[in-house]
């Protein structure tokens, strides 16, 4: 083919990935795409000329015209070889730059292209710029170390500036866009200046890299020198006899292994690691890992136990001193100790104390440890979301450690402590695993004698540990909950809070705030006032904070006024210390009202009175429900409405009231969400009262779920609800008959002040709650 510079040619185009071919450059290419193979075959049949053009994106499998650069290199095919896998290996030599004017229709890329004319340089100018480029490239080669020196020799034989620029570009580690830019720059001076700028940047980077390598090498030499000197020092000390009395590190570790009395499996594993340590360089990173592993193995208590107390009377005394109430928990601990007296080897119980915040779950764990004579260790599980927190990290990880369980056992030093798993319901899981699943083995008495920590890699016996878990709710995974003996701690009664404050909290805060016992007196009435009007909680944390506030103000008053020798806090002057009352517990209404019923509610901080209001008015049968009611409570209203409709005739209500009356049911404190089925009887009573004009007795409160047949079903939280009724001045409480068995857990002073009436049918409720007997009430099941 005649390569006249002004000539336009029609030529096959071969797209290339990540490669830019320059003139005078010989390069092998591997071609696999069908269109590209067709392109080469056509070129071989004609004049063996092909235009090599780079793709803009290398990952494009089927490039279009827009995916190719406009400027490429016309090359001659020197050799073409078809490979067995269907691909083609071709050897090409770049000839001259060319620019694509437009593409023509074909099975492959066929374009009309035009040769690019490179302007010639002045001989003097060419000599100067060639010399500068070669000198800079020589400096680049010395730092790069990857380009063979022969390349520099070949460059010295090139006088033509354009060819020199292309040769340098072919050996430079440039990005594809930069290589393409070199191809597209027509002016040779500009092309070489661009390359020299690229070389300058690369030289700067290589110099920084060289400095870093030098520092690393120097540091390594320093470490090797220190190791050599340490070994020399040991040899000198040995010759002088200075180390004869000093114990050998390996002998010390072996002695610790012997003294730990670990099981055979653990001993073999530890001694195997000790032998590995002896063969390692003391300064190596692996030696540190092995030494750390051995230290953990000998620090874990394998056989050492604390002596468990078996004196039941003393244990009961300790539990009663530390905590007021909580009889069921104390009873369970004493049962365990009683059995321990008869059986020497008894697996520790796994208890789960479930109750609201502040009722003494965590402090009770410490008291149980004191009563049983066990050492106490606590592990907070709130926010734990990584399985490795329980099972540990495998030793392949850098900085790996045993799980918190083994760490705590190592710290406590005995294998039979009381282990408190605090806030077990606050665990969660993520991509790193589920810690709750890891605890399944720990809390299973049949499996925890062979607990396997990922770090230790041997079984560890946890069967002697007495596990006590605490939780605010029953929101614990089922399999985990099934392994524990759940003991529920309900909120303290007002009487229990009063006794706790008198026995523990007041004395504690008096000492903590620097008061003497004779300088402050807090009367019982003041404590009850704090409980009722300044705190709303199931526990006593808020109560303790308020008592602390009183003590602080008492200290301030005594120091500011020398005439004040002591302070007495009563209900009358409580406001001076704590400010205005923050809460107002529900109280019984003073008069009987139509359509208004007092229900009983359970909350996380105890029980409360729940007022339910109902109004009926002429309308079209619309039922309105307000007061932030949940789905279950709204369904209770629907069920109550059905019960009233089914008994309308017997109750003296027009049977078509649901078509001619609009009814509005409202539960005050609308900003507070309310839900649950236990207000069913109260809803039904309020509807009957509003529709018949029969007032509801103000001294009566009720709780119970209602069915469509009018049966009253059992509810939960009876203790808290009766305490709220007692505190609110209620005289009579109607409860489901099936809840009668729960009355045994109610304090005697509460039962004595309340008339508790178990009921099974809504008819019984209406007869007691309404001021006048409903018309035609019959005590019979509605079949």
UniProtKB/Swiss-Prot annotation:
Primary localization: cytoplasm
Enzyme Commission number(s) from the entry: 3.4.21.53
PROSITE patterns in the record: LON_N, LON_PROTEOLYTIC
Residue ranges annotated for the Lon N-terminal domain, each copy included: 11-203
Domain Lon proteolytic: 591-772
Record-listed ATP binding positions: 355-362
A single cellular component GO annotation: cytoplasm
Matches recorded under InterPro entries: AAA+_ATPase, ATPase_AAA_core, Lon_bac, Lon_bac/euk-typ, Lon_lid, Lon_proteolytic, Lon_Prtase, Lon_prtase_N
Keywords: ATP-binding, Cytoplasm, Hydrolase, Nucleotide-binding, Protease, Serine protease, Stress response
CDD domains, sorted: RecA-like_Lon (cd19500)
Subcellular location: Cytoplasm
Any one of the GO BP annotations: cellular response to heat
Matching NCBIfam families: lon, PRK10787.1
Designated name of the protein: Lon protease
Organism: Vibrio parahaemolyticus serotype O3:K6 (strain RIMD 2210633)
């Amino acid at each position: 083919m005649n390569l006249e510079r002004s000539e336009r040619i029609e030529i096959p185009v071969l797209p290339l990935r990540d490669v830019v071919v320059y003139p005078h450059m010989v390069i092998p290419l591997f071609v696999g795409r069908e269109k590209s193979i067709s392109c080469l075959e056509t070129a071989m049949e004609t004049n063996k000329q092909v235009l090599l053009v780079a793709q803009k994106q290398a990952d494009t499998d089927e490039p279009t015209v827009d995916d190719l650069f406009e400027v490429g290199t016309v090359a001659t095919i020197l050799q073409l070889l078809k490979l067995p896998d269907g691909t083609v290996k071709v050897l090409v030599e770049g000839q001259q730059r060319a620019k694509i004017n437009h593409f023509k229709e074909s099975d492959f890329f066929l374009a009309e292209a035009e040769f690019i004319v490179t302007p010639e340089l002045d001989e003097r100018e060419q000599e100067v710029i060639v010399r500068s480029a070669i000198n800079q490239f020589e400096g680049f080669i010395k730092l790069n170390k990857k380009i063979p020196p022969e390349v520099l020799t070949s460059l010295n034989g090139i006088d033509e500036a354009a060819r020199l620029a292309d040769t340098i570009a072919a050996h430079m580690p440039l990005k594809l866009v930069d290589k393409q830019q070199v191809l597209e720059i027509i002016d040779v001076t500009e092309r070489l200046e661009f390359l020299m700028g690229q070389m300058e940047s690369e030289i700067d980077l290589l110099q920084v890299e060289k400095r870093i390598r030098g520092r690393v090498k120097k540091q390594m030499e320093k470490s090797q020198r220190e190791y050599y000197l340490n070994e020399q020092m040991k040899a000198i000390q040995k010759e002088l006899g200075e180390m004869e009395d000093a114990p050998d590190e390996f002998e010390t570790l072996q002695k610790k292994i012997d003294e730990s009395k670990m099981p055979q499996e653990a001993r073999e594993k530890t001694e195997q690691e000790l032998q590995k340590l002896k063969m390692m360089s003391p300064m190596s990173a692996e030696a540190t890992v092995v030494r750390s592993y051995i230290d953990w193995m000998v620090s874990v208590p394998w056989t050492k136990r604390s002596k468990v107390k078996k004196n039941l009377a003393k244990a009961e005394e300790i539990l009663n001193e530390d905590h007021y109430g909580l009889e069921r928990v104390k009873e369970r601990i004493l049962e365990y100790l009683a059995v321990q007296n008869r059986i020497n080897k008894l697996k520790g119980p796994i208890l789960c104390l479930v109750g609201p915040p502040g009722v003494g779950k965590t402090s009770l764990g410490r008291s149980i440890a004191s009563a049983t004579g066990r050492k106490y260790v606590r592990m907070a599980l709130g926010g734990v979301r990584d399985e490795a927190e329980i099972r540990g990290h495998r030793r392949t990880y850098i900085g790996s450690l045993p799980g918190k369980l083994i760490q705590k056992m190592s710290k406590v030093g005995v294998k039979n402590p009381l282990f408190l798993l605090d806030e077990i319901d606050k665990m969660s899981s993520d991509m790193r695993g589920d810690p709750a699943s890891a605890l399944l083995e720990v809390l299973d008495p049949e499996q925890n004698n062979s607990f396997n920590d990922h770090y230790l890699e041997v079984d560890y016996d946890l069967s002697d540990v007495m596990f006590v878990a605490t939780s605010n709710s029953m929101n614990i995974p089922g399999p985990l909950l099934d392994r524990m003996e759940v003991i529920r701690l309900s909120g303290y009664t007002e009487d229990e809070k009063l006794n706790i404050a008198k026995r523990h909290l007041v004395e504690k805060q008096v000492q903590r705030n620097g008061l003497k016992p004779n300088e402050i007196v807090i009367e019982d009435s003041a404590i009850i006032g704090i409980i009722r009007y300044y705190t709303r909680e199931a526990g006593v944390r808020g109560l303790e904070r308020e008592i602390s506030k009183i003590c602080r103000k008492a200290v301030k008053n005594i120091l500011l006024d020398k005439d004040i020798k002591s302070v007495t806090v009563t209900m009358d002057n409580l406001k001076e210390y704590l400010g205005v009352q923050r809460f107002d517990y529900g109280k019984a209404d003073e008069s009987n009202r139509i359509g208004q019923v007092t229900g009983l509610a359970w909350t996380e901080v105890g029980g409360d009175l729940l007022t339910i209001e109902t109004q009926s008015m002429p309308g079209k049968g619309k039922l309105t429900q307000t007061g932030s009611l949940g789905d279950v409570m709204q369904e209770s209203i629907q069920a109550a409405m059905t019960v009233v409709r089914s008994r309308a005739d017997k109750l003296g209500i027009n049977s078509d009231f649901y078509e001619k009356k609009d009814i509005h049911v409202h539960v005050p404190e609308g900003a507070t969400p309310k839900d649950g089925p236990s207000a069913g009887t109260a809803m039904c009573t309020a509807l009957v009262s509003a529709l018949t004009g029969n007032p509801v007795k103000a001294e009566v409160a009720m709780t119970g779920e209602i069915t469509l047949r009018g049966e009253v079903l059992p509810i939960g939280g009876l203790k808290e609800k009766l305490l709220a009724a007692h505190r609110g001045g209620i005289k009579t409480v109607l409860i489901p008959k099936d809840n009668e068995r729960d009355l045994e857990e109610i304090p005697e002073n509460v039962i004595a002040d309340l008339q508790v009436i178990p009921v099974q049918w809504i008819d019984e409720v209406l007869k007691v709650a309404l001021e006048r007997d409903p018309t035609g009430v019959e005590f019979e099941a509605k079949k």
